[in-house]
Amino acid sequence: MKELQDIARLSDRFISVELVDESLFDWNVKLHQVDKDSVLWQDMKETNTEFILLNLTFPDNFPFSPPFMRVLSPRLENGYVLDGGAICMELLTPRGWSSAYTVEAVMRQFAASLVKGQGRICRKAGKSKKSFSRKEAEATFKSLVKTHEKYGWVTPPVSDG
C-alpha cells in the first residue's frame, strides 16, 4: 500500500505505523507529536507519554471510504475523543470523506482537533486505567454520525471541548 510507504518516508517522525497481525487493513498508528504549546503536550511530558496510540481499520474499498479510527491509549478526555476512543470528526464519515485524503493528512487533522478541543490525558483514579473498547467505539461512532446527520456538523466553541 502506497500510504504505508509514504509514512515511512516522513522526515519529521510525526507518526509511525505497525501492522496488526501483518494485515494491510489494520494499523496501529503512533501519533508522536501534537502542538508543543498545548496542554495536551504538557500532559504527555508530565506523564511520560511518548505517543498517542490509535487503531485504523481500512474497508476493502479504501480510499473511496474512510477508515474506522479510534484511540487506544492513553485514555483521553475532550478533544473530540468520545466513549470507547471514538473520534468525532466529519472527515471520518462517508459524507465527509474524500478519496484524496491521505492517512498523514487525517492524522495531522486529528492532532489539530485534539488540541482545538482541549484534549487532555485522563488522570482520574480508576478511569485512567480503563481501556477503550472497539465495540464501545463503534457504537459511539454510529450514534454520533446519526446525530450529526440529523442536526448537521458544527464547530462548537473551544470551551465545549
Curated annotation (Swiss-Prot):
Pfam annotation, one family: UQ_con
Signal peptide: none
Boundaries of every UBC core domain copy: 1-154
GO biological process: protein polyubiquitination
Subcellular location as annotated: Nucleus
InterPro entries: UBQ-conjugat_E2_core, UBQ-conjugating_enzyme/RWD
GO molecular function: ATP binding; ubiquitin conjugating enzyme activity
Principal location: nucleus
Catalytic activity from the UniProt record: S-ubiquitinyl-[E1 ubiquitin-activating enzyme]-L-cysteine + [E2 ubiquitin-conjugating enzyme]-L-cysteine = [E1 ubiquitin-activating enzyme]-L-cysteine + S-ubiquitinyl-[E2 ubiquitin-conjugating enzyme]-L-cysteine
Pathway: Protein modification; protein ubiquitination
GO CC terms of this entry: nucleoplasm; nucleus; plasma membrane
EC number: 2.3.2.23
The entry's keywords: ATP-binding, Chromosomal rearrangement, Nucleotide-binding, Nucleus, Transferase, Ubl conjugation pathway
Source organism superkingdom: Eukaryota
Family: Belongs to the ubiquitin-conjugating enzyme family.
Subunit: Interacts with FBXW7.
Protein name: Ubiquitin-conjugating enzyme E2Q-like protein 1
Origin species: Homo sapiens
Biological classification of the source: Eukaryota, Metazoa, Chordata, Craniata, Vertebrata
